[in-house]
Amino acid sequence: MSLNMFWFLPTHGDGHYLGTEEGSRPVDHGYLQQIAQAADRLGYTGVLIPTGRSCEDAWLVAASMIPVTQRLKFLVALRPSVTSPTVAARQAATLDRLSNGRALFNLVTGSDPQELAGDGVFLDHRERYEASAEFTQVWRRLLLGETVNFNGKHIHVRGAKLLFPPIQQPYPPLYFGGSSDVAQELAAEQVDFYLTWGEPPELVKEKIEQVRAKAAAHGRKIRFGIRLHVIVRETSDEAWQAAERLISHLDDETIAKAQAAFARTDSVGQQRMAALHNGKRDNLEISPNLWAGVGLVRGGAGTALVGDGPTVAARINEYAALGIDSFVLSGYPHLEEAYRVGELLFPHLDVAIPEIPQPQPLNPQGEAVANEFIPRKVAQS
């Protein structure tokens, strides 16, 4: 099975070390462009662009990278409760059209009550997933070309429609990650790819089996991806030394503050990440070559595969054997590590190298009439 390998655009900062300004660098458009172009040339399928108040806006970043890349896809966040599904569908179709079919979307419900309150969202965990399920249903139907009337608990639209369809049919693929029961149910019913953070293989296997069974109950099949950091070097000793350097500037106070911030979230996935290390520096290798040091201060994906190329490839193939075909990777700093992964890891894997998409012809169209419909040629009798 060929594997889709994604990289990451660090719109929330980058550097050589975690938790310090030491070794950090400016993350401006030029730097993000360097990373995107490196990923494009090295054969990555796409890049994940993060979302949240600590990040630059993912949609604007993705749009700015379209003209400077050729085949790279952009995995961009959809934010239910923050954006209406109709506006989000219009944005999604536009990004897909402008990129010639290189748009992918990642459903992000949010998990930090403080951040959500700042965005005007005051729903609890279950309500957010209810709203997300309604949002996704409307979003998908619009991209399928339907005129949508929907009267749900959280979402209400009347006569919603898109005038400009996406390039990808039936619609651009939808990704989603969540560990709670309600999150897995949403994934099983509506998304195309279920993502998990990098837990030990036995825990990932359990999740996959749960989601696969729930999808089957809806008469659906779903694909799987995993989000991991990677520290790969020519030798395993060098890789483990690099891992230790990454957290060498962390002090206990910074770790404690980070863990306190994570504790206030209601994300089951974040709780599972935190439980892998319990905020302690010792015993960070939680499974062979799976290191939890990143999660001491980084929210979300908090584990890294560490080792030489063949060793890390073997661990990736263990996850692939569970049914995972998409790997969303990153490393610090992201420009240099994009090359290291491409040069030291890719040769040991069956990597699906994306082709440069051919321009897709769009139907000729005049200006929309009364903002209501696109004029079409009328057959003469």
Swiss-Prot record:
Pfam families: Bac_luciferase. One of its GO terms (biological process) is alkanesulfonate catabolic process. Keywords: Flavoprotein, FMN, Monooxygenase, Oxidoreductase. It catalyses: an alkanesulfonate + FMNH2 + O2 = an aldehyde + FMN + sulfite + H2O + 2 H(+). GO terms for molecular function: alkanesulfonate monooxygenase activity. It comes from the Bacteria. The keyword Oxidoreductase applies. CDD domains: Alkanesulfonate_monoxygenase (cd01094). Its EC number is 1.14.14.5. NCBIfam families: alk_sulf_monoox (TIGR03565), PRK00719.1 (NF001939). Belongs to the SsuD family. Homotetramer. HAMAP family: Alkanesulf_monooxygen. Catalyzes the desulfonation of aliphatic sulfonates. FMNH(2) which is absolutely required for this enzymatic reaction, is provided by SsuE. This is Alkanesulfonate monooxygenase. It comes from Escherichia coli O17:K52:H18 (strain UMN026 / ExPEC). The lineage of its organism: Bacteria, Pseudomonadati, Pseudomonadota, Gammaproteobacteria, Enterobacterales.
